[in-house]
């Protein structure tokens, strides 16, 4: 079984921004739809068993290669807006019995443009698709994540000393890790 277990922010670290599967989930996302889309990391757990012991010389084929995510949207409140299903790229290799992260644009720019200057809550229903190492197509569980679209949202970044500049890991229009780089 392939399970999307949480949505996490990138964290600023020396040398750039990183994702860590032990990061706590931000239970409610926020972004400014006038500034573009909304991106975070999905933590995926591969609960499939290592199948290399089924026959002599067999190799494990249950590692999961992420290819894309299909995202459906359910509007919770606000003015009626059509939010069409989106297919967005993803990439990661999740080893058997392990966890991994794929960065996904949960609300792509076309959906953000449809929301426009409206304030609303949107439920994103994300399912990740890919292949096992034997080529079979598989998909993860569906994960629901609620995001507040707020055209007045402004990310509060750090105060940096020159020559450093403020860095917003996943974009300055959304909740994300920040630092000086």
Regions found by a protein language model. Give the residues of each.
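Non-catalytic macromolecular-recognition regions in eukaryotic signaling proteins
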Residues: 1-181
């Amino acid at each position: 079984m392939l399970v999307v277990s949480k949505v996490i922010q990138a964290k600023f670290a020396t040398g750039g921004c990183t994702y860590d599967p032990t990061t706590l989930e931000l239970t409610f996302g926020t972004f400014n739809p006038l500034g573009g889309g909304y991106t975070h990391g999905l933590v995926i757990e591969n609960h499939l068993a290592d199948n290399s012991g089924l026959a002599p010389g067999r190799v494990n084929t249950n590692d999961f290669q992420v290819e894309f995510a299909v995202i459906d949207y359910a509007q919770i409140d606000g003015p009626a807006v059509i939010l069409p299903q989106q297919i967005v790229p993803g990439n990661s290799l999740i080893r058997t019995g392990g966890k991994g992260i794929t960065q996904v644009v949960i609300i792509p720019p076309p959906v953000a443009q449809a929301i426009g200057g409206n304030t609303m809550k949107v439920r994103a229903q994300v399912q990740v698709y890919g292949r096992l190492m034997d080529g079979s197509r598989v998909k993860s569980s569906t994960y629901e994540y609620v995001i507040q679209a707020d055209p007045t949202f402004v990310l509060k970044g750090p105060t940096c000393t020159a020559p450093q500049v403020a860095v917003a890991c996943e974009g300055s229009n959304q909740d994300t890790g920040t630092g000086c780089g």
